[in-house]
Each structure stands twice: as structure tokens, then as C-alpha cells.
Amino acid sequence: MTIAFQLAVFALIATSSILLISVPVVFASPDGWSSNKNIVFSGTSLWLGLVFLVGILNSLIS
């Protein structure tokens, strides 16, 4: 169970870092939002799911 928690936290940190870089780049590019909004929404959904997963796993471990 601890390994799953550690992997979920690592995935959350990695996803946060990727979104931290990619979202401003998408908004700054001339036609970026209209062509990449599905990717941004998918990344945001993944991030939100990982937040809940880490919370659930944290409550099971402690």
C-alpha cells in the first residue's frame, strides 16, 4: 500500500510540474487554446483524480 501511495504522490508531482509549464505556454501561443484545450482539460482531470487518489490512499495508510 505504501508503494501505491508513493507512486500516486510522484504522479501528482509530475502532473503538476507538466501543467505548470504547459498551461501558460498554451495560453501564450496565438492559436494554442483552441487547438489544445482538450489536452489541458485532460491534464486537469488527471490532476484532480490524482488529488483525490492521494487523499484516499493517505487516509488508508495513516
Swiss-Prot record:
Q: Write down a Pfam family by its short name.
A: Ycf9
Q: Name one GO cellular component term.
A: chloroplast thylakoid membrane
Q: Where are the transmembrane segments?
A: 8-28, 41-61
Membrane protein topology class = Multi-pass membrane protein
Protein location: Plastid, Chloroplast thylakoid membrane
Query: Which one GO biological process term can you cite for this protein?
Result: photosynthesis
Ordered alphabetically, the record's keywords are:
Chloroplast, Membrane, Photosynthesis, Photosystem II, Plastid, Reaction center, Thylakoid, Transmembrane, Transmembrane helix
Please state the protein's primary subcellular location. Answer: plastid
Quote the function comment for this protein.
May control the interaction of photosystem II (PSII) cores with the light-harvesting antenna, regulates electron flow through the 2 photosystem reaction centers. PSII is a light-driven water plastoquinone oxidoreductase, using light energy to abstract electrons from H(2)O, generating a proton gradient subsequently used for ATP formation.
Quaternary structure note? PSII is composed of 1 copy each of membrane proteins PsbA, PsbB, PsbC, PsbD, PsbE, PsbF, PsbH, PsbI, PsbJ, PsbK, PsbL, PsbM, PsbT, PsbY, PsbZ, Psb30/Ycf12, at least 3 peripheral proteins of the oxygen-evolving complex and a large number of cofactors. It forms dimeric complexes.
Membership in a protein family: Belongs to the PsbZ family.
Q: What is this protein called?
A: Photosystem II reaction center protein Z
The scientific name of the source species is Spinacia oleracea
What's the encoding gene here? psbZ
